[in-house]
Regions:
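Von Willebrand factor A/integrin I-like adhesion domains
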Residues: 147-207
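Von Willebrand factor
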Residues: 1-60, 67-107, 110-114, 121-122, ...
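Short cysteine/histidine-rich zinc-coordinating motifs and their immediately flanking basic loops
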Residues: 240-248
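Arginine/glycine-rich "motif VI" loop of SF2 helicases in the C-terminal RecA-like domain
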Residues: 39-40, 131-138
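Cys/His-rich microdomains that often coordinate metals
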Residues: 234-239
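Short cysteine-rich clusters marking metal-coordination/redox-active sites
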Residues: 227-233
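Short, flexible, mixed-charge glycine/proline-rich loop motifs
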Residues: 214-225
Length: 256
């Protein structure tokens, strides 16, 4: 049976601290629960999870859906997207089965790249390598979380860019339901011997296709994260501050 590889490449930088990281971890578990209930997915889908911050690590190598065990997502400083791309391409070379005269290889892999900010390393060489050797060999869906995403860089990787700004429990639930439905639809179609576009229609209350990357550029003014170091133990720690909006009464806020 030919495999359908699915890679989750997840930004676990300090800006994801708190509920966003928890919701992302729960979302991956939600996807796997849906996949395990589908006979087509159980036969074809193989899943890998790669986390990146200042370093990149494979948390789960490419495994069958029924054997997948959801890992705890780490948290780190920095967002090395270039290193994450290099790591992903190395994983492709190491684990994907190519079609030869003797054997049919894997179906076209699907990659879900989730990031909420700007790269903190140089991406040019990784992007060049990606476009030259890998971009046509897989479907990369880049998802920008929040309102401070570098969509210009993501556009250099793929035309499939999704903006997801509702980083609450309900928003994450809808988002990962969309991923589940997309993977299930693709696994069923290849079960019938046909590959289709894994991008299903979006629920535009939560998700939007990004066409004009310049218009979506921005900086999150409602959150700031600091990296500190303990003076006693000399160990790093993170501090995240969210702006709490204070709404004044009409009388106070009226223009005089």
């Amino acid at each position: 049976m030919r495999r359908l590889p699915v890679f989750f490449v997840l930004d676990c930088s300090e800006s994801m601290l708190g509920e966003p990281l928890q919701h992302m971890q729960q979302g991956v578990q939600q996807v796997m629960q849906h996949l395990r209930q589908d006979p087509y997915a159980l036969e074809t889908v193989y899943v890998s999870v790669i986390a990146f911050a200042g370093i990149v690590r494979t948390l789960v190598p490419l495994v069958e859906a029924f054997a997948f065990y959801p890992p705890p997502l780490p948290l780190g400083s920095g967002s090395h997207l270039g290193a994450a791309l290099e790591h992903l391409m190395d994983e492709f070379d190491r684990y994907l089965i190519k079609t030869t005269e003797e054997v049919k290889g894997d179906w076209k892999p699907i990659v879900y790249l989730l990031t909420d900010g700007h790269p903190t390393d140089r991406c040019d060489n990784a992007i060049y390598r990606w476009q030259k050797r890998y971009a046509r060999r897989c479907t990369l869906i880049a998802v920008g979380l929040g309102n401070s995403v570098d969509f210009v860089t993501l556009r250099k990787l793929t035309e499939n860019i999704v903006s997801f700004e509702h980083l609450n429990e309900e928003g994450f639930k809808k988002f990962f339901q969309w991923i589940s439905a997309s993977v299930l639809s693709q696994s069923k179609s290849i079960g019938d011997g046909v590959e289709q576009n894994p991008m299903l229609p979006l629920d535009e209350r939560y998700l939007q296709i990004v066409k004009d990357v310049q218009r979506h550029q921005g900086v999150d003014e409602n959150c700031v994260t600091f990296v500190g170091r303990c003076g006693k133990l000399n160990r790093p720690y993170l501090m995240k501050f969210d702006k709490e909006l204070q709404y004044a009464s009409e009388e106070v806020s009226a223009i005089k």
